[in-house]
Amino acid sequence: MFHLRTCAAKSVHKSWDIFFRNTNAGAPPGTAYQSPLSLSRLGFYGLHESDLDKSTRFEEFLQRGRLNVLANVIRYHLGMYHRRSSPYPTDVARICEEAFTRRQILLPFRKPLIVFTPKSLLRHPEARTSFDEMLPGTHFQRVYYDLTRAKPVWYAGRKTHLTELQRFLDTAFDLDAFKK
């Protein structure tokens, strides 16, 4: 599982207050909705521009330990209500799902929403969303996490799992491929 470093709650409280003061003083209306993480405020979150470049990988981002302030703000102010905001969408429809964009707008606080997804994953046939799922009368499927039964999992980032799944399906009934 992911282990996030912690620091003193007092410094987190001070940093969070500074963030709100700066946002209220300098951000034009609606900016928080359009771009929750501006490049000018990356330093506050412990992030650097290199963390958000085109080749950033989700695993490397978590290993760098840049989310320590965010994790402490969650623990200190919200009582584990909102765990993290670094989603990894599995298809195009999930980017606009309640767990991503809608939740970000409806929450009473602002926190960076960092979305990792490769372009090739969004173009993959298995990741496509049909228009039938977006018609009037449909709704988003909710996902509830039962953290009391959390277990360590293996994580395959980027398009690795789709590539491996396709390789498995191509060779599932071809016994000669397994003899090699």
From Swiss-Prot:
Annotated coiled-coil segments of the chain: none
Keywords, ordered alphabetically: Glycolysis, Magnesium, Mitochondrion, Nucleus, Oxidoreductase, Phosphoprotein, Thiamine pyrophosphate
- Entry's InterPro entries? 2oxoglutarate_DH_E1 (IPR011603)
Q: Which GO terms describe its cellular component?
A: mitochondrial matrix; mitochondrion; nucleus; oxoglutarate dehydrogenase complex
Q: What class of enzyme is it?
A: oxidoreductase
- Tell me how this protein assembles: Homodimer. The 2-oxoglutarate dehydrogenase complex is composed of OGDH (2-oxoglutarate dehydrogenase; E1), DLST (dihydrolipoamide succinyltransferase; E2) and DLD (dihydrolipoamide dehydrogenase; E3). It contains multiple copies of the three enzymatic components (E1, E2 and E3). In the nucleus, the 2-oxoglutarate dehydrogenase complex associates with KAT2A. Interacts with ABHD11; this interaction maintains the functional lipoylation of the 2-oxoglutarate dehydrogenase complex.
Which family does this protein fall into?
Belongs to the alpha-ketoglutarate dehydrogenase family.
Q: Please name the PANTHER family in this protein's record.
A: 2-OXOGLUTARATE DEHYDROGENASE, 2-OXOGLUTARATE DEHYDROGENASE COMPLEX COMPONENT E1
Name of the protein this chain belongs to:
2-oxoglutarate dehydrogenase, mitochondrial
Gene source species: Mesocricetus auratus
Q: Which gene encodes it?
A: OGDH
